[in-house]
Amino acid sequence: AAHIWVKVDNEEYYNWGELIRSINAKINEATSSADKQIGNWFVRVGKENTISLKKLVNKVLFYLWNDIYKDFDKDDDGYIFGNIENFESFFEPEASDDMGTELVDGINLKRVKDFIGALNDVHLYSKPSFDSRADLPEDKPEFETASSEE
């Protein structure tokens, strides 16, 4: 999973290994069940070891919303969706956004980034070097976080 990337856009990526570790910790807190956790191959990996943003939302976030957190109230401890009222809001522009929210493949990019940003130890990375991935240790991302390139 260390060499699998969730493609946010052409320049930004999340590391799949970081993402599932953080999500699985939240699932464990919510359910106390290892059976509900997601594995490395929960989502089919595409070209260049990437998972599209659309697949992440339609498969992973939908699973969390529909199967893990369906009985949670948004005020419950451990609820990970914050102020998100309904799952469809991942596909809609912000109601209060006069400038127009960026939709990528029909996905509200800001809402997804805000959701993932609230998870522990998940970083946004700049474009990876796919040619070098075979030489990396299993637990190390192959490029720097976007915030470290300032």
Question: Can you name each region flagged by the protein language model?
Answer:
Residues 1-150:
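C-terminal regulatory/interaction module of P-loop NTP-utilizing enzymes
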